[in-house]
């Protein structure tokens, strides 16, 4: 299923790129951060340090990630903590979160973007805040042997129905998660 998703997302990449360019024109993305979204202009964490990658989509998820990052920093004071966001407003908030060593834009879910980003960051663990599941990213992480945890996730009946409709395409993401810490 990972190959099917990768083929489909690659086939749709011209349309997705047009949407990305539109977001730049609307001010929802910035050209200066395009390299991060494509996984090419990322700082390599220092060697010899465990890397933990926390992904929070926007402001709400970033705020929810603060206690996780605080406890992670207490438990692993020498770790390198990367916090990624998808939105510019989330990035602004993320840049002020104590204990974070690196703030980046989350890579677009194209196979070449996610694999480049994951090879550069090389995390020991990926923590996804809420149920923000990207099949390409999670599938690539699994192929690299990186565990993935979803924290603070919620599934409404509507979301579950939607996911079930696309379960064949989403199975790499769902099956790739090692730990689910969900809200009821």
Question: Model-predicted segments: where are they?
Answer:
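Membrane-interacting alpha-helical segments
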Residues: 1-19
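Active-site and donor-binding regions of nucleotide-sugar-utilizing enzymes
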Residues: 17-184
């Amino acid at each position: 299923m990972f190959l099917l998703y990768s083929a489909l997302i690659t086939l749709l990449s011209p349309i997705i790129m047009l949407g990305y360019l539109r977001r730049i024109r609307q001010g929802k993305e910035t050209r200066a951060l395009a390299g991060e979204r494509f996984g090419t202009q990322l700082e390599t964490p220092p060697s010899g340090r465990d890397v933990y990658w926390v992904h929070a989509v926007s402001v709400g998820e970033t705020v929810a990630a603060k206690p996780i990052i605080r406890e992670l920093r207490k438990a692993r004071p020498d770790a390198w903590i990367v916090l990624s966001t998808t939105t510019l407003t989330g990035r602004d908030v993320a840049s002020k979160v104590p204990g974070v060593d690196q703030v980046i834009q989350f890579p677009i879910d194209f196979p070449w973007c996610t694999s480049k980003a994951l090879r550069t960051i090389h995390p020991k663990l990926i923590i996804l805040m809420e149920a923000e599941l990207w099949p390409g990213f999670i599938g690539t992480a699994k192929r690299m042997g990186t565990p993935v945890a979803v924290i603070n996730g919620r599934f409404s009946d509507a979301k579950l129905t939607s996911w079930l409709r696309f379960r064949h395409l989403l199975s790499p993401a769902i099956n790739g998660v090692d730990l689910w810490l969900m809200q009821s």
